[in-house]
């Protein structure tokens, strides 16, 4: 049943109908459409469009429909309705007859769909925040169990300074914390109810929109009807948050792929998250991580698509805005799946502690400690930086680590070096000295783990 037609003397061509209809994807808004309709039925009582008895009949029928939808949402797709709004109204009329035709009084599909997608997005935010917390928890627990695992930290993919595997884990906890708070910020901005805005100019009935917003679990009603039906900021914000978080997950995946490589051999991924080769029997490929990295592009693509869709739209509603749904549905599904898979990757990970320590001892990653040592002896840092650079060149030439050079060899470059230099060149010293807040010292890492556990509720 179409919700329009009196203006037309010919039926829509099937080719146009197939092109125009959106039920194949907006069926996912069925619950929100029904819940919004229940709220609207109550508002219509307040302006004497419906009696109390009529509203009760409608609410009963809508609740029955809600139960049916929740038990088998895919059944909706067997229908030929144009969109989810048409489908709900058609099913309601099947249940209560002509009374169902009164429900759309004062309402437009423009404010109806704006409500539906906002309600759906709000529910997704809460679910995604839980999923982000679950990955954070897995990272924190992994960090807690790997505080002893020393490894190289990198810049430019070159060994830079020693860190711990735990410190690496906690870096991603912090990235995810920002993702979590961005979701919360987006929720606050989308928590205004557009229902009652009509097609663009507002409803003709003196409905208390603040009460309607409260009934539908919004903090307030929107303030401008034209903006209310034109606004898709909440979708763009969620796509932006998802894209940035997927970039974080992609970096996590890339690190894991490198750490898992035969060249690094820092970690071993479980058989449960890897696959083999159809030709090379020895292969164990990090497919879970590669797919996380690969799926990042499609989420970012959805953001770019939505920004491009809205950039040139005149106010208010245009059919272009139907394109808002498939992108957000796919992007948030993908983000959720990747968060879940990243946590699964960590579930059985094995850290090769001996190999990470061996790698941390190479590459002169204690060179900065030597520069700081010279500064403590009164050498200006810029001079000490140059001296240590020359010392490293010499050490490379004689195939020694800095910690293996003799005092006499050190003194070729600076006469302030003495036997106490060896105390600061050990891996443990390198870690211990980074003791400012956020640093890699075991004490600070332990504090960061404890703080994160408190923040995400692991101590409960």
From Swiss-Prot:
Gene Ontology process terms (BP): arginine biosynthetic process via ornithine; L-arginine biosynthetic process
Pathway membership, UniProt: Amino-acid biosynthesis; L-arginine biosynthesis; L-arginine from L-ornithine and carbamoyl phosphate: step 3/3
CDD domains linked to this entry: Argininosuccinate_lyase
Catalytic activity: 2-(N(omega)-L-arginino)succinate = fumarate + L-arginine
First-listed, main subcellular location of the protein, grouped into a coarse class: cytoplasm
Compartment(s) of residence: Cytoplasm
EC number: 4.3.2.1
GO cellular component, one term: cytosol
GO molecular function: argininosuccinate lyase activity
Keywords: Amino-acid biosynthesis, Arginine biosynthesis, Cytoplasm, Lyase
Domain of life: Bacteria
Keyword Lyase: yes
Gene3D superfamilies documented for this protein: Fumarase/aspartase (C-terminal domain) (1.10.40.30), Fumarase/aspartase (Central domain) (1.20.200.10), Fumarase/aspartase (N-terminal domain) (1.10.275.10)
Family the entry assigns: Belongs to the lyase 1 family. Argininosuccinate lyase subfamily.
The name this protein goes by in its record: Argininosuccinate lyase
Protein source organism: Actinobacillus succinogenes (strain ATCC 55618 / DSM 22257 / CCUG 43843 / 130Z)
Recorded name of the encoding gene: argH
């Amino acid at each position: 049943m179409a919700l329009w037609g009196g203006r037309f003397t010919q039926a829509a061509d099937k080719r146009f109908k197939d092109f125009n209809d959106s039920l194949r994807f907006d069926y996912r808004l069925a619950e929100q459409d029904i819940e919004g309709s229940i709220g609207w039925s109550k508002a219509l009582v307040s302006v004497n469009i419906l009696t109390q008895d009529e509203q009760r009949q409608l609410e009963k029928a809508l609740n029955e429909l809600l139960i049916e939808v929740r038990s088998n949402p895919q059944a909706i797709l067997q229908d030929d309705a144009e969109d989810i709004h048409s489908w709900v109204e058609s099913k309601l009329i099947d249940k209560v007859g002509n009374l169902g035709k009164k429900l759309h009084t004062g309402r437009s599909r423009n404010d109806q769909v704006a409500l539906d997608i906002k309600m759906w997005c709000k529910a997704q935010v809460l679910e995604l925040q839980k999923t982000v917390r679950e990955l954070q928890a897995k990272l924190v627990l992994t960090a807690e169990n790997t505080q002893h695992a020393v490894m190289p930290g990198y810049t430019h993919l070159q060994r830079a300074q020693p860190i711990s595997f735990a410190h690496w884990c906690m870096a991603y906890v912090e990235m995810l914390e920002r993702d979590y708070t961005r979701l919360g910020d987006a929720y606050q901005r989308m928590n205004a109810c557009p229902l009652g805005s009509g097609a663009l100019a507002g409803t003709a009935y003196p409905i208390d929109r603040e009460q309607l917003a409260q009934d539908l679990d919004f903090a307030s009603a929107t303030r401008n009807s034209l903006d209310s039906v034109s606004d898709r900021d909440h979708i763009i914000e969620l796509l932006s948050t998802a894209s940035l978080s997927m970039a974080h997950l992609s970096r996590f995946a890339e690190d894991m792929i490198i750490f898992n490589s035969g060249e690094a051999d820092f970690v071993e991924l479980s058989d449960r998250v890897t696959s083999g080769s159809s030709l090379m029997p020895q292969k164990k490929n990090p497919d879970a991580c590669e797919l996380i990295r690969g799926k990042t592009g499609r989420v970012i693509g959805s953001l770019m698509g939505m920004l491009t869709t809205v950039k040139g739209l005149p106010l208010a509603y245009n059919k272009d805005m139907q394109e808002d749904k498939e992108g957000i549905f796919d992007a948030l599904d993908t983000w959720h799946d990747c968060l879940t898979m990243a946590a699964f990757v960590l579930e059985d990970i094995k850290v090769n502690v001996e190999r990470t320590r061996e790698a941390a001892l190479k590459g002169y990653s204690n060179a900065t400690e030597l520069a700081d040592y010279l500064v403590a002896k009164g050498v200006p840092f810029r001079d000490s930086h140059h001296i240590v650079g020359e010392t490293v060149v010499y050490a490379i030439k004689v195939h020694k680590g800095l910690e293996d050079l003799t005092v006499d060899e050190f003194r070729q470059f600076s006469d302030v070096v003495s036997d106490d230099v060896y105390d600061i060149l050990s891996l443990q010293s390198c870690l211990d000295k980074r003791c400012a807040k956020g640093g890699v010292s075991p004490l600070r890492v332990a504090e960061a783990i404890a703080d994160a556990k408190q923040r995400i509720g692991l101590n409960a």
